[in-house]
């Protein structure tokens, strides 16, 4: 149905007591103008009725278990969905189809697939919420360009965390170019990425940067084992492969701690020329005596204190002569450690990999991808067991704050009313005033220009430190004013603030803003001249 006729169709649907409508049509908010008006009208109809709408500008959905496929994606023709406990929620129909297709090729069963498009009504947050509440869903993959209802989105992520269901999230629009593309695609305003990053982390979802990583992590959740620690054990037949994985583990914040000395001695007794530290190298003796594999792994799990193990077997596991004996050895090794996660990095045929999977052993070819997937499982283990601290919200103070840019002195006075004590100075409006307040102190003074038009004082020469005498203070006062007039001639100057120097400690920056999506947020990080250079801040 063309966009200009959709509103009439939706109105007719309401008259016939329809409960849901799926709108494939494009030509709405994503093109602006008249399309935006059409979409607003659809939203109004939903608000005034019991109708729920998916879309417009979406590719539909499916339920593989009930074989319900209201979608026009061509992927269904090429790959009939395999029912499973993984589901997909995507704002983009085409990219949602891409995620489904590569999932199918990976052998992952997808139960529900939902694309939300422009979200005149149903949002991706609501879709995640529905999936999190469904007992038939264990893992959720989500593609998000923007969030319109921050509270709803947070509640969905929190529901999934409480249910111990991994949410693997691809949030795009990180760059200015990407954000602009998102806006033209589904009329999405991407928002400040640093805030999204913190929301995702704080509420237990795992953010990925690629489809490959998304699929790897979803695949790794199949055993439903989420370690609560970050200690990684590596067993390998290749010293080089072990080094590669150790580096990758360091990159993602995992610990590759050495085996205890007693355990190392026992490993040496089994294979004198083995490397018993961690990575544990079983060497080529592996080919002659596979019984060393369960012995090594047992020592690693019983004495090494590792929360998960990755085994690097390269193409050996794919050998017809070695694949089954190795699998038998791994089954023996893990028979007493069903609560531990073990990931194989190996190169083998699809049949061999599936055979290993049926026995509960994951297989990821690239060892660094195996490490990243293990890190994701450990991340979920940490988040699923994280205690949520309840914050006592104080009633707001009734303070009259002027609706204009405030200078530094005014800001300090307001913050003091909230019991935030800062290094308050004196405002000087002429050089003669310095004599009235200057006293010799050990650490000296700092002088700063005060202007609501100047955010970064260093850039305009508006600050001077370590002032140790009255004459120097008078000289610096004149220098600061001259610097500012030269470099920022249009700035309105309220004066110069003089404060005692404070040495030692760490200079920090603290800020607050009302985000249009998530509401009030607080920013904290490294302050001073390093704020813009290092950008070491968190929300």
What are these regions (language model features)?
Residues 1-539:
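Catalytic-core regions of core metabolic enzymes
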